[in-house]
């Protein structure tokens, strides 16, 4: 079985440094943070959260899961991510998503939600150029500039790894054209293998070498000895986060039950091709640290 990397989501905005240190001490390969400008409750900003985590750690990689790419101008995001990569001594991974499930945040940012895909594709082109070239000129639909050099450029060469999130075919094509990895969420093992094949086909059609492409997975976990309690907590946490009823579908999209149950379910994803597993916590707030420990010590070693 191929080795799998594991990441832990930083769940609280108030104890980021402590949680990041804990994840690093438990052997996680990544800590990760997502973002929204607004959502169904309080939500972080990915880059600020990861900057705090960077200052509290020395080894663990820092992944955005994800930055909402179309809500940034490419120059601003290129600058922020480059500085974060330099400040963290080359540990940043940029996961991007196009969003759209909460249109109000697009309205508030003055970005037409229907442009999110085209804006994201162009932004990826611009950011990669700014990360890797000097005296850059670009003329596109949304960005136009001449003679721009980003300083500093990222520590990682040729640039920080790019991960594309999303379940639609357009996201798979975006991953094939621009990214180093793919991170779907709310996905089943049955869907996974075929999607990886589709990404590689898109890459082949574009003439892009994807031999080092990394299929990832963003998944929720609720680890309790009692399987019913674990499922109930997963449904409650996901329902609160996404403002919908997860009572009948939490089991499809979360690892839940005791560590053995979680290993069994995760193996289905790994057998389907997942090689980087990023775990977010769908449990009681007071149980997050214990869940993080159980996944690190009793689930992850089976796939290392």
What are these regions (language model features)?
Residues 21-25, 50-59, 81, 85-91, ...:
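Acidic (Asp/Glu)-rich catalytic clusters
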Residues 61-74:
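Structural motif corresponding to the early beta-alpha repeats
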């Amino acid at each position: 079985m191929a080795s799998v990397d594991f990441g832990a989501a930083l769940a609280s905005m108030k104890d980021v440094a402590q949680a990041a240190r804990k994840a690093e001490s438990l052997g996680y390969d990544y800590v990760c943070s997502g973002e929204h400008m607004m959502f169904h409750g309080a939500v972080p900003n990915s880059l600020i959260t990861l900057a705090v985590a960077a200052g509290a750690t020395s080894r663990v990689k820092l992944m955005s899961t994800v930055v909402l790419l179309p809500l940034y101008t490419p120059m601003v995001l290129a600058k922020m991510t480059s500085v974060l990569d330099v400040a963290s001594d080359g540990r940043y991974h940029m996961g991007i998503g196009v969003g759209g499930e909460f249109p109000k945040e697009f309205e508030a940012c003055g970005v037409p939600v229907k442009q999110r895909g085209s804006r994201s594709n162009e932004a990826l082109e611009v950011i990669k150029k700014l990360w890797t070239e000097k005296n850059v000129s670009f003329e596109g639909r949304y960005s136009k500039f001449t003679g721009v050099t980003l300083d500093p450029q990222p520590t990682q060469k040729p640039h920080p790894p790019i991960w594309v999130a999303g379940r639609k075919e357009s996201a798979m094509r975006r991953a094939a054209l621009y990214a180093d990895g793919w991170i779907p969420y709310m996905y089943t093992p049955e869907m996974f293998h075929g999607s990886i094949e589709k990404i590689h086909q898109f890459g082949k059609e574009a003439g892009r070498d994807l031999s080092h492409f990394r299929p990832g997975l963003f998944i929720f976990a609720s680890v309790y000895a009692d399987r019913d309690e674990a499922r109930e907590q997963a449904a409650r946490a996901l329902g609160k986060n996404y403002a919908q009823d997860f009572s009948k579908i939490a089991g499809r999209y979360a690892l839940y039950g005791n560590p053995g149950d979680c290993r069994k379910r995760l193996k289905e994803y790994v057998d389907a091709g997942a090689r980087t597993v990023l775990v977010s916590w769908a449990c009681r707030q007071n149980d997050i640290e214990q869940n993080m420990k159980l996944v690190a010590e009793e689930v992850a070693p089976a796939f290392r």
